[in-house]
Amino acid sequence: MPRKGPVPRREILPDPLYNSRLVARFINRLMYDGKKGAAEKIFYSALDTLAQKTGEEPLKAFEKAIENVKPHLEVKARRVGGATYQVPMEVRPDRQVSLSLRWLIAYSRSRGEKGMVSKLSAELLDAFNNRGGAVKKKEDTHRMAEANKAFAHYRW
């Protein structure tokens, strides 16, 4: 194993339209097979639709949707004396964003609408209004952490 130390993290450049790193990260997660142009087209169209339906600025609406999906607690498996406990932990801010992006994309892909633009805009609108699959996932995660609060002393 190489001993040169940790590999430096690559800096993600902000996207050209909104000049936002968050948008750039979302587009990168949305992308399939290196087709960034297609991912950008899908995302920007979905954001325009979201802005029309909410009547807010597109970037502000997107950020609010992300904020509504961010988990604050999660459970991690921890082995103690042959038993595995689900230990509730606080989620680091960078992981909160990563999980929310991942969940929004996953739940928009599994929706029933036709075309990714309508799926994504519908999921973002639901997240903006505090409902939908991604918000439900966040609530389930919080519920799991709450149910396993008794094991919080195993935190490391």
Swiss-Prot record:
Top-level division of the source organism's lineage: Bacteria
KW Calcium (keyword) present: no
Coiled-coil parts of chain: none
GO cellular component: small ribosomal subunit
Keywords: Ribonucleoprotein, Ribosomal protein, RNA-binding, rRNA-binding, tRNA-binding
Nucleotide-binding recorded as keyword: no
GO biological process: translation
Family: Belongs to the universal ribosomal protein uS7 family.
Assembly with partners or alone: Part of the 30S ribosomal subunit. Contacts proteins S9 and S11.
Functional description taken from the UniProt entry: One of the primary rRNA binding proteins, it binds directly to 16S rRNA where it nucleates assembly of the head domain of the 30S subunit. Is located at the subunit interface close to the decoding center, probably blocks exit of the E-site tRNA.
Protein name: Small ribosomal subunit protein uS7
